[in-house]
């Protein structure tokens, strides 16, 4: 019993263990199917129905062998262990580096209690245990707890025998493993984007501050006042089958369109009420230029590609924040009254859904939010993004097409018309993220789906005219344009000080905003301080002409 008390006290050092501790303290072991066997060295082996889940004779050696297969150096890592059954794996992993942490996902309270009653460990302060939690709660915790910059540190190890002791456990751990892998891929994609785009975001923010004035998106807060419904249009291939229906709905619905879906609308003489663009300057910029001609409001960020916005009337641009790069400085507080924060979350569709909710419509109607492929296409035929489908179709036999994983990933997903369609790991990951957000919004605003070829979203029903009794023309009026609360001068002064002082000291906060990749390489001693300064000075020289405009 002393072991258990000591172990619980150690686990209490981490606030994220409190739920697990409460479950352990309440649980009483009765008629256990698990048992403990001691070897000659007083090391334990866990048995299930008298069958060992780990080595009876050499659990430490087994642990070393398994961990060393997954870890080739002793740098700090975050280990995710599916089942506590072989605690020696976890303990050995933690012993390799004092800064490593372990997250244990365990379905059975019984086995966890049995182990904590019998083991001794000096590493429990660095353990988080998620005990008999719902799968969606595990994924939500992972999303919240693991920072993007830490995603490279993760190793994930499933205890094969413990996760297959019965059908229920197998289903549980298989689902957790699948969803975690998708979430890790999503965060790796985001990290890669951050490494690549951060210098561009930083430059764009400075350019937009200098040349592209606008208002806060708070100008549009609650503008629909639960009276006018909203149609959110993404660029999935399904919308090509619904052009006439979208034309009809545009008379009574506020049309909010993603930038890469905008071309589909203007090519079919449909004028949206607003366009959302958060892109770094690729195919969507052409569509934004068309939006300028059409006099359509643009919801965007200071980190977005700046050229198409130049010389637009200030009353056409409405900014929100991703809280990325220099946005963390120019906005005094991401939660302040005038600055609206919608996280990037890997895809423009996520902040667009948040904006839809922010406008407070009668209901939200989705179109083209497919998360799957229709006739080997992932995008509308009018979208410039359709080029990705061509590259991915194997009509081009080049190394380049290996970079695109939206097609031919051998994943299937069920759609509203009950047909299984091809998808990909990345699209399924985005769909799950989108579904989680949608189900939070549904508590306040109903969400429907127009396009039956789209992947099914939990609790989002297919739309029909019975859902809608919209007879009045939409009438959207802006009475008060709200200025952004931006610390422009303070930011410029801090940037100038950072550049001038870089020979003496490196402000880690600024350095990480300009180039997290180079800063990471510097911290890991993969590049010298001189090489890092050369990169920063090169970046600064490229934006000097913009800084002179302030």
Cite the ranges covered by each PLM segment.
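Class I S-adenosylmethionine
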Residues: 1-78, 86-92, 198-219
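Acidic, Ser/Thr-rich peripheral helices and adjacent loops at domain boundaries
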Residues: 121-129, 276-282, 289-294, 380-402, ...
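Aromatic- and Gly/Pro-rich donor/ligand-binding loops
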Residues: 174-228, 239-241
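SAM cofactor-binding core of SAM-dependent methyltransferases
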Residues: 78-132
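Short, polar loop motifs at secondary-structure junctions
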Residues: 86, 107-109, 259-263, 300-307, ...
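Long, compositionally biased charged/polar accessory segments in the mid-to-C-terminal portions
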Residues: 428-550
């Amino acid at each position: 019993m002393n072991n258990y008390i000591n172990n619980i006290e150690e686990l209490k050092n981490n606030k994220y263990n409190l739920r697990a501790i409460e479950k352990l303290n309440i649980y009483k072991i009765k008629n256990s199917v698990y048992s403990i066997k001691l070897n000659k060295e007083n090391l334990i082996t866990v048995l299930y129905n008298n069958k060992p889940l780990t080595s009876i004779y050499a659990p430490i050696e087994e642990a070393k062998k398994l961990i060393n297969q997954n870890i080739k150096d002793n740098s700090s890592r975050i280990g995710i262990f599916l089942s506590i059954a072989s605690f020696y794996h976890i303990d050995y992993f933690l012993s390799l580096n004092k800064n490593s942490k372990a997250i244990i996902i365990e379905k059975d309270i019984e086995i966890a209690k049995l182990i904590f009653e019998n083991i001794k460990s000096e590493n429990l302060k660095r353990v988080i245990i998620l005990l008999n939690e719902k799968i969606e709660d595990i994924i939500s915790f992972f999303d919240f707890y693991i920072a993007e910059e830490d995603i490279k540190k993760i190793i994930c190890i499933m205890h094969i025998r413990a996760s297959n002791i019965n059908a229920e456990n197998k289903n549980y751990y298989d689902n957790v493993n699948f969803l975690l892998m998708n979430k890790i891929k999503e965060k790796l994609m985001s990290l890669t984007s951050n490494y690549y785009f951060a210098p561009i975001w930083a430059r764009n923010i400075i350019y937009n501050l200098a040349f592209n004035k606008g208002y806060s998106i708070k100008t549009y807060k609650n503008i629909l006042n639960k009276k006018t419904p909203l149609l959110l249009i993404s660029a999935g291939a399904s919308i090509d089958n619904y052009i006439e229906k979208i034309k009809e709905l545009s008379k009574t619905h506020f049309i909010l369109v993603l930038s890469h879906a905008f071309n589909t609308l203007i090519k079919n003489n449909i004028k949206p009420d607003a366009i959302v663009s958060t892109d770094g300057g690729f195919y969507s910029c052409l569509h934004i230029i068309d939006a300028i001609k059409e006099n359509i409001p643009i919801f965007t960020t200071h980190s977005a590609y700046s050229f198409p916005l130049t010389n637009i009337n200030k009353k056409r641009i409405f900014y929100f924040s991703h809280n990325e790069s220099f946005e963390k400085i120019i906005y005094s507080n991401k939660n302040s009254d005038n600055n609206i924060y919608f996280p990037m979350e890997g895809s423009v569709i996520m902040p667009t859904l948040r904006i839809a909710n922010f406008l407070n419509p009668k209901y939200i109607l989705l179109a083209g939010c497919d998360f799957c492929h229709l006739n080997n296409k992932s995008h509308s035929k009018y979208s410039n993004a359709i080029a990705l489908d061509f590259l991915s179709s194997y009509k081009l036999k080049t190394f380049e097409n290996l970079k695109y994983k939206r097609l031919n990933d051998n994943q299937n997903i069920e759609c509203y018309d009950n047909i299984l369609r091809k998808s990909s790991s990345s699209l399924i990951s985005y769909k799950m993220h989108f579904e989680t957000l949608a189900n939070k919004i549904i508590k306040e605003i109903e969400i429907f789906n127009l396009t039956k070829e789209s992947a099914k979203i939990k609790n989002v029903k297919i739309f029909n005219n019975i859902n809608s009794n919209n007879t009045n023309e939409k009438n959207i009026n802006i009475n008060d344009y709200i200025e952004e609360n931006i610390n422009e001068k303070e930011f410029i002064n801090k940037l100038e000080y950072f550049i001038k002082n870089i020979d003496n000291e490196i402000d880690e906060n600024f350095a990480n905003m300009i180039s997290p990749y180079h800063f990471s390489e510097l911290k890991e001693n993969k590049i010298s301080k001189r090489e890092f300064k050369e990169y920063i000075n090169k970046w600064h020289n490229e934006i000097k002409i913009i800084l002179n405009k302030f």
